[in-house]
């Protein structure tokens, strides 16, 4: 594998939008066929978790953009993310003729996960681990599809924010990182796209409340990744396949987050 590995984090309501998911995987197929570049997908699936918990009569809250995960709920959340969401992604890959392997953060020790904050319950902090398994899978021509469920050294299932998980995986692989969500990138106070975002500007926008909640988590993860990887991280949308192909080919799309 001579070409730089690319980690793509898929988020937002994508998993509930079958048409968009189909278009995305068609774009990824074109990219893989044309570029022959190693690719890793990392996904969450918060909308599936919300639907499942609601169906079970359970409540779900967030604190600073992170889902509070009571330990009694983690079996359901792990089932939604590592089970349903992961296999839905796998199904699209297979239907698009992309050979893929479904994984979680614990497989092969890819990421080291510990409890982030007791107040959040079974929510994990994610650090880069051993990339050997994923590197081997990539070397065999498969697409790793990784859910954001981790396991601690004590064997406890943990729900990890998918942006943070993708960052840790990119660090472990020394890869480029693209974060795809519902929005076209980072937006300013007037709803306009910010093409380039540095740490000083990002902190200022967060202090003013322009960037908050889930987007703040995303920006912090992107800043951390940009600093660790020593290169910009892109935050863009999955909604426009033509723009996505341009982005994957190195074009300027979305927001470039740099230190």
UniProtKB/Swiss-Prot annotation:
User: Which molecular function GO terms apply here?
Assistant: acetylglutamate kinase activity; ATP binding
Say if the entry is tagged with keyword Amino-acid biosynthesis. Answer: yes
Describe the reaction catalysed, as an equation.
Answer: N-acetyl-L-glutamate + ATP = N-acetyl-L-glutamyl 5-phosphate + ADP
The record's top EC class is transferase
Q: Which GO terms describe its cellular component?
A: cytoplasm
- Predominant cellular place of this UniProt entry's protein: cytoplasm
Q: What is this protein called?
A: Acetylglutamate kinase
Which GO annotations describe the biological process of this protein? Answer: arginine biosynthetic process via ornithine; L-arginine biosynthetic process
* Annotated compartments: Cytoplasm
Q: Which family does it belong to?
A: Belongs to the acetylglutamate kinase family. ArgB subfamily.
Please give one Pfam family short name: AA_kinase
Q: What is its EC number?
A: 2.7.2.8
Q: In which pathway does it act?
A: Amino-acid biosynthesis; L-arginine biosynthesis; N(2)-acetyl-L-ornithine from L-glutamate: step 2/4
Which keywords has UniProt assigned to this entry?
Amino-acid biosynthesis, Arginine biosynthesis, ATP-binding, Cytoplasm, Kinase, Nucleotide-binding, Transferase
Query: Out of the domains of life, which is the source?
Result: Bacteria
Task: State which gene encodes it.
Answer: argB
Query: Any idea what job this protein has?
Result: Catalyzes the ATP-dependent phosphorylation of N-acetyl-L-glutamate.
């Amino acid at each position: 594998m001579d070409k730089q590995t690319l980690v793509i984090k898929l988020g937002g309501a994508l998993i509930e939008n079958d048409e968009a998911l189909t278009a995305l995987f068609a774009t990824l197929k074109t990219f893989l066929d044309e570029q022959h570049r190693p690719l890793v997908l990392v996904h969450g699936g918060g909308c599936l978790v919300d639907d499942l918990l609601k169906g079970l009569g359970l409540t779900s809250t967030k604190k600073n953009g992170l889902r509070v995960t009571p330990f009694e709920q983690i079996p359901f959340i792990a089932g939604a993310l590592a089970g349903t969401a992961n296999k839905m992604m796998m199904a699209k890959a297979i239907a698009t003729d992309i050979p893929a392997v479904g994984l979680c953060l614990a497989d092969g020790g890819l990421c080291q996960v510990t409890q982030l904050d007791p107040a959040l319950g079974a929510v994990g902090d994610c650090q880069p681990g051993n990339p050997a398994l994923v590197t081997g899978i990539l070397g065999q021509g498969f697409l790793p599809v990784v859910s954001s469920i981790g396991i601690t050294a004590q064997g406890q299932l943990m729900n990890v924010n998918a942006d943070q998980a993708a960052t840790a995986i990119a660090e472990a692989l020394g890869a480029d990182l693209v974060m795809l969500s519902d929005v076209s990138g980072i937006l300013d106070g007037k709803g306009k796209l910010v093409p380039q975002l540095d740490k000083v500007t990002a902190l200022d926008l967060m202090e003013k409340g322009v960037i908050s909640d889930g987007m703040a988590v995303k920006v912090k993860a992107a800043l951390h990744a940009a600093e660790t990887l020593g290169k910009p991280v892109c935050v863009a949308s999955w909604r426009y396949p033509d723009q996505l192909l341009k982005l994957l080919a190195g074009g300027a799309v979305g927001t470039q987050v740099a230190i």
